[in-house]
Amino acid sequence: MVIDPYRTRTAALADEHLAINPGTDAALALGLMHVILSMDLEDREYVAACTNGFEELRAHALKPEYSPESVAKATGIDAGVIVRLARAYAAAGRNGSARPAVIRLNYGIQRSENGGTAARAVCMLPLLTGSWKYKGGGLQLSTSGSFPFNEKALQRPELMLASPLGRAARVVNMSQLGQALTSLGDGTDDGPRVKALFVYNSNPAAVAPNQNDVLRGMRRDDLFTVVHEQFFTDTADYADVLLPAPTFLEVKDVQGAYGHLFAQVSNRAIAPLGEARSNVAMFGELGRRMGFDEACFDDREDELIDQALKTENPWFAGITRERLEREGHVPLQMPVDANGDVLPFSTAEWFKTASGRGELLPVPVFAAPTESRAHAAEGAYPLEFLPRKADNYMNSTFANIPLHQRMEARLAGVLEMHATDAAARQIATGDAVEVFNGRGSIMLRALVNAQVSAGVVAARLDWSKLGSDLSGNRANVNALTSETLTDIGGGATFYSTLVEVRKGQDDVR
């Protein structure tokens, strides 16, 4: 079963696709808890041994606002389907069932205003049903957190506190770059105006939210901008100084993973071309030229890899740079059960929380995103907008490659919308349409289909500097997104965006 507001290729292959309303995943998770707990379907033995806060969560989830009927109104998923899903999920793997329940969480759930709460709520489901006890059960988002690299040795926070300015350096959230470049230093107590921008490993002119403010800030005459890049990206066009960067083939690094449990070293295939310098070499030399005399500015890749692997965590026991260079990849030394299987969170020993258990506190509370259909009737923008990732690009990376452009051509510059919304606006497939809100607008071609539900429209982040919207403006979906941050972690809220759509001029290209 796939739960997604968009009918993805994965959803099309699933036994069942639930087209949930954007930003309502926390409500669905709490609705599933309501059914599980009201029917006493939780694994009481596991809950008692491995969780903290069960009674508080139980009382909260059994509130009327999380009944299947209430949750159905928020999520758009039928109450009967919610009950059926909860019962099937709780039963999987138990009472002789051969297939345990596993949840494959992905990153999209986090990109809503309540995304942190949503992710927490979903993660509580296997804590209630005990599906962690079964091989193949539980939940996966990413295995990246399983690699206990010594981040403190790499980040050196004590040097930040020893700033010659007498205070810690100001931190600006990268998802609020537009605000930082246009509003910081405007006379409030948020510090001085940003006067220099150093961009590496990113293309904020294309991928940062609230694109119009980002570009307005980058066009400031008094902003000194340095861009360290491999290609002439959107951001490179705004650089006062453009420095050549190597590709991953030209640098050495230690690697964790998103989906496996092997530590690796990636060696250089070739030396850096031309004058390209790695991040390590560039910032080391820059630090020296700025007068810093700490030894860390002389560290190079081998020294940093050694520092990253130097930790007391037993999962890295016996894993050294020399061994990784010799063997290529080495499995993490994780605990195994009597059968030799790794069963994470199957016992309380796995939880590295203050209580030593899976935390159910504070209880998750569903609140609809400010920009969502729950509030759409209050303003001029009634449609929820999904700025989807392209299948053949990584954000804006690879968007300059003709082969990838050809593979993306079918949905490039396209707005997908439901027939109900299209008919209400007298829009047909192929029409030029303007998608707009108070932050900006883009021109696209309409594609009327059933990939989205009524009230939802979708378009892909599929332009680099080599492309533009239909009006000829170099704008993409981020002209519409906001700099509002998620409730946990301060992430971007790309999927909490309201828009309106109107038919455009026929003479746009």
Regions found by a protein language model. Name each.
Residues 214, 220-224, 228-231, 265-288, ...:
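Phosphate/diphosphate-binding loops
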Residues 273, 279-327, 401-416, 420-509:
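Long, contiguous, secondary-structure-rich segments that constitute the structural scaffold
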Residues 49-52, 106-108, 138-148, 299-313, ...:
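A glycine-rich phosphate-binding loop feature that marks nucleotide/adenosyl-phosphate handling sites
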Residues 6-98:
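Long, well-ordered, tryptophan-enriched scaffold segments
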Residues 42-47, 98-102, 133-140, 294-301:
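Flexible, glycine/charged-enriched surface loops at secondary-structure junctions
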Residues 1, 26-30, 73, 123-238, ...:
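Extended redox/cofactor-interaction regions of prokaryotic respiratory oxidoreductases
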Residues 6-9, 232-266:
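Flexible glycine/proline-rich, aromatic-decorated loop/lid segments
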Residues 13-14, 53, 64-70, 104-109, ...:
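Flexible glycine/proline-enriched surface loops and loop-helix/loop-strand junctions
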